[in-house]
Amino acid sequence: HVVLNWSIEEILNKDCGNKEVYKYRGKKYTFDRDRVNWLQDQVRQYIDDGSKVYVILLLGKDAKGQAGKMSYGGGKIFSSIKTTSAAGCRTWEAFMSYMAEKFGNEQHLVSGWILGNEVDSPYDWNYAGGKSLSAYMDDYARAFRIAYNATKSVSSHSKVYISLDYNWNQDVDGGGNSFFSTKKTLDTFYSKLKAQGKICPNIAYHAYSQGLVEPKFWDDSLAGSGVDSTIITMKNISVLTEYVKKKIGKDATIMLAEQAFNSTQGEELQAATYAYAYYISEGNKMIESFIYARDTEPQSDVDQGFYWGLRDINGRERKIYNTFKVIDSKESLDKTKNLLSYTDLSSWTQIPGIKKSTFKNNRSIKNKWPPLQS
């Protein structure tokens, strides 16, 4: 599985050199033909390599032109999709109709569209003008349904996802409209969605460890065992999956779309934490994929004390790099057994759903990686 970030305003762009005019419901919309062709090539290459492709659609807060009709402006980086105006709503319909046509066929199939980033934290990641949660989710649910209808009209295999972070019952700004708890956001969103006709949403969840810096998620003190837990991390991810199964239904799927583990306490611990988290996701039938957030960490991560990458800022491979390469192979459990001493387990089969035979039908690794040493 591969998750890509795509900028809406780079695709819907009348200032490009090679324009493609798309007519939708009597209006014309201008797309960047070269950009779209490049994205199609990118998707096709991943598909040819055997990967499913998922795309996060992001709208910059300073988007201009036709894309700007969908933007609220303000916030830090990204805007939520503005469907409260006729122009914004119609533009979003046109955009998703176009994207479904371009990326709904077998050669260029986007298997999932993730709308925005961490929508429960609108000020930081999905600004919507400081609205109440109810008004915000009215808008977001409308955008979600438009995307759902557009993609499903072309491909029954494509899904749409809401993006959420780990603040399950934690309201960061204490009742303001800049941040909302994940659970209230999910509940309100699903209520709004059902009110206009039931469809099955999917969730792109970010399962970082508590505080982001400390890698050992099994020690997360705020991650409890019940639905009243403050946060949900890999320690208690089953709280999320069980809640979604009961609230939305067993057909809803959860993608762990972004998480990474710090290497500041040693590369062996980082590798062990990743293997542990991956196996938890593998053993949970409601989790469809686990996406590691960083290949090579950027300077902005390092500046905050986040040394998350499979490779460091200079491109040097950390121990987690080889763990990542073998994690879903036939030899997975054997190649990672030396990492157990860095966890609170004595065997990976202590994880629910993991058996010695779990990976027996998977591909065998081509390169014979030695067991990771301490």
Task: Give the label of every model feature segment.
Residues 1-172, 210-211, 297-302:
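Substrate-binding cleft and catalytic face of glycoside hydrolase catalytic domains
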Residues 1-3, 114, 204, 255, ...:
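Residues embedded in well-ordered beta-strands within globular domains across many folds
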Residues 13, 17-22, 71-74, 81, ...:
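Aromatic-rich peripheral "rim/lid" segments of glycoside hydrolase catalytic domains that contact
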Residues 30-32, 85, 132, 178-182, ...:
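Helix N-terminus capping/helix-initiation residues
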Residues 37-48, 97, 101, 145, ...:
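Surface-exposed alpha-helical segments enriched in charged/polar residues
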Residues 44, 92-93, 111, 135-268:
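Noncatalytic carbohydrate-binding groove/subsite architecture in carbohydrate-active enzymes
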Residues 52-54, 159, 253-254, 288-291:
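Beta-sheet entry/capping signal
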Residues 64-82, 170-187, 264-278:
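Short, electropositive alpha-helical surface patch
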